[in-house]
């Protein structure tokens, strides 16, 4: 899996067949991805300023979109630990223009959660 951020999609590469396909479109300008301990895709979405998980049936579950009542900036890189904890970076560059999201006010400092 990898992101095509400006084209608002997540692509899937099949190493066996060499086929490239669209996994999710729109992706809400998703950037960083990882797998949780159950193999589900967890993504950082710049446009919606949230962390989501793609369920086995394709449904999207929002895991986080706020901290202390304030909207996240533009979650970027992410990792899931063996114990189920999720760590991610939250810089502001996805809300600074239209290239990777939409312009918006920053509510939180740049941080790692």
Predicted features along the sequence, with ranges:
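Sequence-structural signature of mature extracellular/luminal beta-sheet repeat domains
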Residues: 1-113
